[in-house]
């Protein structure tokens, strides 16, 4: 079996060593890295090595139409990892193939940025279980055909991580793991060019550490210390932890905040070339040791910045990225009843190279940040600032005529910037309709919810639900009464899973059943051969800004999706798309003149 590792390592050895030495010029560090790789391979179980072999023979496994994902917090869904494993029948009922558990490694309590402040990259947080519990869970999921994804927070550690504690105690070895400064001279120069992530709740990019009498670079919160990737020991230690988790059965790593990991004075410290060197090296390490494992990048950047994070077909980096831009544009199109920006953004994504793949979603653990393409807005005579303000006020429910119930996050009155929080159902109007007892409003809210999910599932890549979306879970306003959670409005959509409502998922006519059945229809849709990994996907002009058209082609087969983003009947004309088409119920459809119901998603197939 060691021959497999040797053969894989031989393919990457020259490039890996060249990149490492170019970045670090540290032969000793390179030798340590290569020993860690060999040790990790030796420690990998026979079952996981068999998975490596199968995945190497099927590199498109995560691009197939049957991929269907879900993300959740372990504690909110089931309490802990042992209890979550008992929920496997619920996952199998939904035919999930991908489960992303929010950060579950050891973290400080209660303030940990939702788990993104990590105290130990090798150990499950005791509140959620043990490493053995994680390993048992991954084994059960694997038998069920479900790949487990975990976050790997690359940019920073908690200020209570053992490295940080050693640094505070004066250990120079571990002080070199962070960016530390004795006075404000260099930090002030950084502040001139580096944007602030949380200007209101965590202003500035540096925090004073009284124990060391030094300034620490803290891009996010003051308890999250940025790692110094210019130190090869940091890269080696972090890679060792990823390999450790991979050997526990983790199959996908969401590498968090990856554009931020390299720091250089005089720059924004975003998207620097060295970031790509590090991700490329990490990709090669995984391909040598555990090729079943893939990387999902969290890159909250404009579409033009995304392609670089995939690398090239010859020298790939991330296997896939979160499709943040489309998520934002979907919500924007729904509130504005205008799909022009969404279409333009999708056209930009479709122009990316064929190796680019996305995880599509509507809601996740985070807020909706209104990072729309301002140049595109101006092309359509849309004022970017007024548009942004309209959107976040609309989804907070304080704009006249809004159906949504949500909250603002990180509102900055000086810049007029804010983000939006809330569950999919509540933002689509379900919560408001239930409170008012308006059955017509509820019907429209459900239509909106299903419309957005339909578009998401049709896109290039695969869909990922936020836990609770499949049963129309509402906002959890009770977070306001918890002093440990009340100061973060993102907790509005981070509430305990409603198992009582979930019991209604099979009861015809109930609200949970409508969403549950809607998700089942999407899985059936994705079984079509037009969802093959190499299918061609594009938008199509509908001659109506309220209607989006998406076309999928594979071989001789064509599948067309028409999506009405308005509450009115809407016409669409795809006169340039030739051929004859039928709807799912067998009715002929003339694409040159189609009439859609309010918020209808219509799928038609060529005959």
Positions of PLM-derived features:
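Active-site and adjacent substrate-binding regions of carbohydrate-active enzymes
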Residues: 1-576, 585-607
């Amino acid at each position: 079996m060691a021959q497999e590792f040797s053969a894989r390592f031989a393919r990457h050895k020259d490039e890996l060593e060249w990149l490492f030495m170019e970045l670090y010029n540290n032969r000793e560090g390179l030798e340590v890295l290569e020993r860690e790789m060999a040790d990790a391979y030796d420690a990998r179980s026979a079952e996981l090595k068999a998975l490596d072999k199968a995945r190497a023979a099927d590199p498109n496994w995560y691009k197939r139409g049957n991929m269907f994902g879900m993300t959740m917090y372990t504690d909110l869904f089931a309490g802990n990892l042992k209890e979550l494993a008992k929920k496997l029948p619920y996952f199998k009922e939904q035919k999930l193939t991908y489960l992303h558990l929010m950060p579950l490694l050891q973290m400080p309590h209660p303030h940990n940025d939702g788990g993104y402040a990590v105290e130990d990259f090798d150990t499950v947080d005791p509140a959620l279980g043990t490493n053995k519990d994680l390993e048992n869970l991954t084994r059960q999921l694997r038998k069920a055909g479900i790949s487990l994804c975990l976050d790997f927070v690359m940019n920073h550690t908690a200020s209570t991580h053992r490295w940080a504690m050693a640094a505070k105690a004066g250990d120079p070895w571990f002080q070199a793991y962070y960016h530390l400064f004795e006075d404000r001279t260099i930090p002030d120069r950084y502040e001139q060019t580096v944007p602030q992530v949380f200007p209101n709740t965590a202003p500035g990019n540096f925090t004073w550490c009284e124990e060391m009498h030094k300034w620490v670079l803290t891009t996010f919160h003051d308890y999250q210390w940025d790692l110094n990737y210019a130190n090869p020991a940091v890269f080696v230690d972090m890679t060792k932890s990823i390999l450790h988790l991979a050997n526990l059965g983790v199959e996908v790593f969401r590498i968090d905040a990856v554009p931020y990991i390299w720091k250089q004075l005089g720059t924004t410290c975003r998207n620097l070339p060295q970031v790509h060197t590090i991700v490329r090296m990490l990709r090669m390490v995984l391909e040598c040791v555990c090729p079943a494992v893939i990387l999902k990048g969290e890159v909250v950047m404009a579409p033009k910045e995304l392609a670089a994070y995939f690398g090239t077909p010859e020298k790939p980096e991330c296997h896939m990225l979160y499709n943040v831009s489309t998520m934002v544009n979907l919500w924007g199109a729904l509130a504005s009843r205008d799909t022009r920006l969404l279409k333009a953004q999708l056209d930009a994504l479709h122009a990316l190279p064929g190796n680019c793949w996305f995880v599509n979603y509507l809601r996740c653990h985070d807020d909706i940040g209104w990072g729309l393409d301002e140049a595109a807005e101006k092309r359509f005579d849309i004022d970017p600032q007024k548009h942004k303000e309209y959107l976040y006020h609309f989804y907070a429910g304080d704009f006249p005529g809004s159906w949504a119930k949500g909250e603002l996050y990180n509102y900055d009155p000086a810049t007029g910037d804010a983000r939006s929080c809330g569950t999919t159902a509540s933002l689509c109007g379900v919560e408001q309709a239930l409170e008012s007892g308006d059955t017509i409003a509820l019907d429209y809210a459900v239509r909106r919810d299903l419309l957005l999910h339909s578009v998401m599932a049709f896109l290039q890549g695969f869909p990922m639900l936020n836990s609770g979306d499949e049963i129309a879970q509402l906002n959890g306003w009770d977070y306001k009464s918890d002093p440990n959670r009340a100061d973060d409005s993102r907790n509005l959509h981070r509430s305990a899973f409603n198992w009582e409502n979930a019991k209604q998922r099979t009861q015809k006519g109930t609200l949970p059943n409508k969403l549950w059945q809607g998700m089942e229809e999407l899985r059936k849709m994705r079984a079509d051969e037009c969802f093959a990994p190499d299918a061609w996907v594009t938008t199509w002009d509908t001659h109506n800004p309220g209607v989006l058209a998406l076309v999928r082609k594979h071989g001789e087969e064509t599948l067309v999706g028409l999506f009405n983003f308005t509450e009115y009947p809407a016409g669409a004309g795809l006169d340039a798309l030739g051929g004859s088409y039928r709807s799912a119920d067998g009715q002929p459809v003339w694409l040159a003149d189609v009439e859609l119901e309010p918020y209808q998603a219509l799928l038609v197939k060529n005959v």
